[in-house]
């Protein structure tokens, strides 16, 4: 199969005014697990270019809020969202929450963070795992009881360890590769449902 950057999902995202095709991965995950509800407060890690935040914003509605964090700027404008351009590892999240009027815990913590790839599979997988572990740590600290967590990672031999680690925190853990994920992609999504 030939790689086509402007595939069906790319065109659909443009038609529906989403910042990126990745929105459909989150939408598929939500359709399967019914995580999003009106009025929720959502923390989006790795928010750029903004499509996951757009989806969360739409689902949370006027009474919900979204806080997005990314190294890269997020240019989408959403009435119920705030975006911080920074390295998550350098932030004092409590200060950021207070500064922007967010009071944890969050209903959903989601991470579409990805490392800058090197082309060296093991290096890229290890960096992806580190980012997912960072996101899991944030979820453990700031996600409410019965809240949900979604994290993208590049599949590797350490995948099972991370899934087992998540099982300590969540009532149910599922691995998902949405149909909208490119066939050649090694990314997979771990979903933690109902934080203990």
From Swiss-Prot:
The active site is at 152 (proton acceptor). S-adenosyl-L-methionine binds at residues 50, 52, 70, 87, 112. It comes from Bdellovibrio bacteriovorus (strain ATCC 15356 / DSM 50701 / NCIMB 9529 / HD100). Pfam families: FtsJ. It is found in: Cytoplasm. Gene3D superfamilies: Vaccinia Virus protein VP39. GO terms for cellular component: cytoplasm. Its main location: cytoplasm. The lineage of its organism: Bacteria, Pseudomonadati, Bdellovibrionota, Bdellovibrionia, Bdellovibrionales. It comes from the Bacteria. InterPro entries: RNA_methyltr_RlmE, RNA_MeTrfase_FtsJ_dom, rRNA-MeTfrase_E, SAM-dependent_MTases_sf. Keywords: Cytoplasm, Methyltransferase, rRNA processing, S-adenosyl-L-methionine, Transferase. Belongs to the class I-like SAM-binding methyltransferase superfamily. RNA methyltransferase RlmE family. One of its GO terms (molecular function) is rRNA (uridine-2'-O-)-methyltransferase activity. This is Ribosomal RNA large subunit methyltransferase E. It catalyses: uridine(2552) in 23S rRNA + S-adenosyl-L-methionine = 2'-O-methyluridine(2552) in 23S rRNA + S-adenosyl-L-homocysteine + H(+). Its EC number is 2.1.1.166. It is an enzyme of class 2 (transferase).
């Amino acid at each position: 199969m030939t790689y086509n950057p402007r595939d069906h999902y790319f065109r659909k995202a443009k038609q529906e005014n989403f910042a990126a095709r990745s929105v459909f991965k989150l939408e598929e995950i939500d359709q399967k697990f019914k995580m999003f509800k009106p009025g929720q407060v959502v923390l989006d890690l790795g928010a750029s270019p903004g499509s996951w935040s757009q989806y969360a914003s739409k689902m949370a509605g006027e009474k919900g809020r979204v806080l997005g964090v990314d190294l890269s700027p997020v240019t989408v404008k959403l009435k119920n969202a705030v975006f911080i351009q920074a390295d998550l590892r350098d932030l004092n999240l409590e200060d950021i929450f207070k500064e922007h009027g967010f009071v944890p815990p969050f209903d959903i913590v989601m991470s579409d963070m990805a490392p800058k790839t090197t082309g060296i599979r093991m290096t890229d997988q290890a960096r992806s795992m580190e980012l997912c572990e960072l996101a899991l740590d944030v979820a453990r600290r700031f996600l409410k009881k019965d809240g949900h967590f979604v994290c993208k990672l590049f599949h590797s031999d350490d995948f099972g360890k991370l899934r087992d680690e998540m099982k300590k925190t969540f009532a149910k853990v599922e691995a998902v590769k949405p149909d909208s994920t490119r066939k050649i992609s090694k990314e997979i999504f771990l979903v933690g449902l109902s934080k203990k």
